[in-house]
């Protein structure tokens, strides 16, 4: 079985890890009407490692993979612990994935079901990635690809930082970085615009982990906890574009049903019968504007 899975594992290609773009939705004229994971209908912005403040790197590592800079792509103790939990549950309830494995999953298996063979393939590719790339490169690729909330405008660290705080990644503070790191475990449930209490508790958990791993002092932790999450957020959500969000949601759901793929995870071009001018007019009327 192991030999079979190894043969079936995709060939590692570092170029495939690049977040070169996002799924794009086109209107009836063939014009771009919506770009997933971007701000103001632009292209998804990728950051470099030099753009990342140390406080963000520390928060992400503390939250997702405390031995990230030490292991070779997968963490054996975590894998063993996860395997025991899965055996006890009688199902694959958790994978103990490292940051490198998460990057591989997002790239090679974005919509795949949890299976032991897929997990094995994930580990093989993660080890290959760790040999081919530096830790800094892996972390940067990961942060450019992952999503941080419910909105399509929170995919990738640059878009998420703009969406929540309306600032550049390099300007992130400790409490902001901890909040973003905390969302990765469950972006849907830790989106502060929808689940403020959950997001606050999770952020504080990450701050505690940062103390545990020696990244910050207890005083720095306490000071960061005193900053209310609601006071860090933009006064209003920065939307992707002026297109009718309901229409985008309907089309997105239809794409998922027809293809079994999620445009948030798998890059694709989506062509619709939407008349953008009509949609803009409807949105204006809905906002009470005079036509």
Regions found by a protein language model. Give the residues of each.
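N-terminal type II signal-anchor transmembrane helix
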Residues: 1-28, 32-33, 87
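Flexible, acidic/glycine-enriched loop-and-adjacent beta/alpha segments
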Residues: 48-99, 152-158
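Active-site phosphate-binding and catalytic loops of NTP-dependent enzymes
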Residues: 71, 289-291
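Non-catalytic, structured segments within soluble enzyme domains
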Residues: 96-284
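Extracellular/periplasmic catalytic domains that process cell-envelope and extracellular macromolecules
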Residues: 16-19, 25-27, 51-55, 132-134, ...
């Amino acid at each position: 079985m192991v030999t079979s899975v190894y043969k079936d594992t995709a060939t590692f290609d570092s170029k495939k890890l690049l977040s070169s773009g996002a799924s794009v939705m086109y209107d009836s004229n063939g014009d771009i009407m919506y770009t997933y994971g971007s701000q103001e209908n632009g292209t998804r912005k990728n950051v470099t490692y030099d753009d990342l403040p140390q406080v963000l790197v520390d928060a992400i590592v503390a939250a997702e993979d405390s031995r990230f800079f030490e292991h070779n792509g997968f963490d054996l103790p975590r894998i063993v612990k996860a395997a025991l939990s899965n055996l006890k549950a009688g199902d694959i309830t958790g994978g103990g994935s490292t940051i490198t494995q998460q990057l591989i999953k997002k790239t090679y298996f974005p919509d795949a079901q949890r299976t032991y063979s897929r997990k094995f393939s994930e580990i093989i590719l993660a080890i290959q990635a760790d040999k081919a790339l530096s830790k800094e490169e892996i972390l940067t690729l990961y942060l450019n690809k992952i999503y941080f909330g419910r909105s399509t405008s929170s995919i990738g660290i640059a878009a998420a930082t703009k969406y929540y705080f309306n600032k550049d990644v390099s300007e992130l503070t400790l409490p902001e970085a901890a909040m973003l790191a905390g969302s990765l475990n469950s972006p849907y449930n830790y989106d502060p615009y929808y689940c403020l209490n959950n997001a606050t508790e999770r952020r504080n958990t990450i701050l505690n982990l940062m103390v545990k791993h020696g990244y910050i002092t207890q005083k720095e932790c306490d000071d960061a906890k005193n900053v209310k999450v609601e006071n860090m957020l933009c006064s209003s959500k920065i939307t992707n574009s002026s297109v009718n969000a309901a229409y985008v949601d309907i089309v997105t759901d239809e794409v998922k049903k027809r293809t079994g793929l999620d445009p948030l995870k798998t890059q694709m071009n989506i062509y619709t019968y939407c008349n953008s001018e009509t949609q803009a007019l409807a949105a204006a009327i809905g906002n009470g504007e005079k036509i």
